[in-house]
């Protein structure tokens, strides 16, 4: 897959494709699981399409594919923030990360420009997954998974 290819070329860690709805939750896993059941039990799968490839100076968003605006996902994000009691000034930017890295901008740009993505690119999100992100990427662990109805 593309993430594996870019990770190999950039000598950076590989990871599973995902859309991050919320991150860095401070509560216990038990509490988060209960809130996930409340929040996601009646949510239908979400169809998400993507617009273009971009890059940022953030490690976890080094090279990304931007998602087209999606009112259902936006509403789910707002609802999840309320369920999980998250107060933030950060703007929700739905995207699919393709590369985690601290590469120099020039090298990142070369990798980004080498990406050929068929159009249109879309995915259907069929589940919500809780991942403990303590430690390095190789220490991340999936702890809970709930299918969308």
Indicate where each model-derived feature is located:
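Basic, often amphipathic N-terminal segments
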Residues: 1-48, 69-124, 136-149
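Short proline/glycine- and acidic-rich turn/helix-capping motifs at secondary-structure junctions
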Residues: 52-60, 97, 128-138
């Amino acid at each position: 897959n593309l993430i594996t290819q870019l990770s190999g070329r950039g000598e950076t860690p590989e990871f599973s494709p995902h859309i991050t709805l919320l991150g860095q939750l401070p509560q216990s896993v038990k509490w988060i699981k209960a809130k996930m059941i409340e929040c996601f039990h009646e949510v239908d799968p979400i169809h998400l399409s993507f617009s273009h490839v971009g890059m940022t100076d953030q490690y976890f968003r080094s090279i990304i594919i931007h998602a087209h605006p999606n009112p259902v996902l936006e509403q789910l994000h707002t609802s999840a923030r309320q369920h999980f009691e998250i107060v933030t000034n950060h703007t929700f930017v739905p995207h699919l990360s393709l590369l985690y890295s601290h590469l120099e901008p020039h090298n990142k740009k070369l990798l980004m420009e080498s990406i050929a993505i068929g159009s249109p690119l879309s995915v259907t999100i069929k589940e919500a997954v809780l991942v403990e992100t303590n430690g390095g990427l190789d220490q991340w662990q999936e702890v809970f998974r709930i299918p969308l109805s």
